[in-house]
Amino acid sequence: RTLYHYSDISIQKVAVVTDGDQAMARELGDNVKQFLPHIGEQADWQYVTGDQYHNVNDLLKIMAECNPDLIVTFRCLDESSLVPQHTLGVYVDVMTQTLSTPILLLPGSAQQPHPLGTRACQGVMVVTNNLAGDDQLVNHAVACTASKSTIWLCHIEDDVLFRRYLEAIGRI
């Protein structure tokens, strides 16, 4: 079994991605700085707005150019015609599959964001399909939380493997 090894992660560049304008992106960035005060002002904050990309490939190129340590965004970017319930949206879905950069997915969606409030982050959920041996993702979660916060580690299985587990449990 691979053991977890803590490493202090320094988040130097944060990309705030929104489908709105520069004012909306900066306001969101200010809210995230309050939410993540230990990253706050020490990081270089870059703002990517809806007029800078028109499709997923455009956004991927921008992310490659700015090379952030953390991407902050909402579900369902640039999908105002949809009423999202159980989807990340095309942009976030592709970014999670093609980029190695951790993504801080904010509550709500781009069309209906939930306010972060004025408190610092008290809990982070790490979601991946292969958590074992992924120290970097867990260390990024630690970097986003204050002391005495909670981190949930969520391992997602595909349907085939999940059914196999259920069958094995059923035989016990």
Q: What are the functions of these language-model segments?
A:
Residues 55-56, 88, 134-138:
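Amphipathic coiled-coil/heptad-repeat helices and related helical stalk/stem segments
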Residues 52-54, 110, 158:
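Residue-level detector of flexible, active-site-proximal loop/helix-junction positions
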Residues 1-50, 120-172:
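Small/aliphatic-rich secondary-structure junction motif
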Residues 48-58:
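Charged docking surfaces used in two-component/phosphorelay signaling
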Residues 60-115:
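Gly/Ser-rich helix-loop-strand patches that form or flank binding pockets
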